[in-house]
Amino acid sequence: PPKKGLYFGGDRPEPSKDRHVYKVLAFDAQSGSKLWEKDVHQGPPTTSIHLKNTYASETPVTDGSRVYAYFGNLGLFCLDMDGHELWTKRFEANPTRYGWGTAASPILHEGRLYIVNDNDKNSSLTALDASTGEEIWRINRDEPSNWATPYIWKHADRTELVTPGRNKVRSYDLNGKPLWQLGGMSSIVIPTPFAKHGLLYVTSGYVGDKIRPLFAIRPGASGDISLKEDETSNQFVAWYQA
């Protein structure tokens, strides 16, 4: 059974009152020597985190000219390759499930940054101009806290932005228009989808759940493609296992 403290927040029910320094560091890939270090924010956290989480769990992304570091409900920081700050986009801090914090990383595609920020309130999906940080579009999401990084799925029919979630796995076009949705995930959604062999694979799992679903999805889906009870496949779900 789940161990209290390890899975349910442990000794961190409230934000730390200590000053935290949020940093971006660059290292030489060949030697491992530090190239530069940039402090982007200092101050006590406004939200708590899970015992196994950090305030810097999100993975930075780069286009080779700029690096984008996202610190969940704190904000997004754009630096040049020498560590100079180019722009900053701050985000409102929202409550997460049991105060566990955030973890979903930004993704970069054709000059846009896509950020999913699923909390226990004010969940959203946002597209930003990568060069300026200006908001291109933003949609609200009917989702509780999730921790899965979105995935850009390119196939012969179109390019999709796939966002796993506890309520639904949802796919959007690059302008935020919903394409399809799929129910049946576990209570905690963390893994990033991926595509191979002409299919998209989406999964989630938690030690306290009875099912840990894995779906293989065909391209071209539309509408609600959720499986009915006792189904393991349909027109757009190639196969499923729990």
Regions found by a protein language model. Give the residues of each.
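Noncatalytic, solvent-exposed loop/strand surfaces
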Residues: 1-242
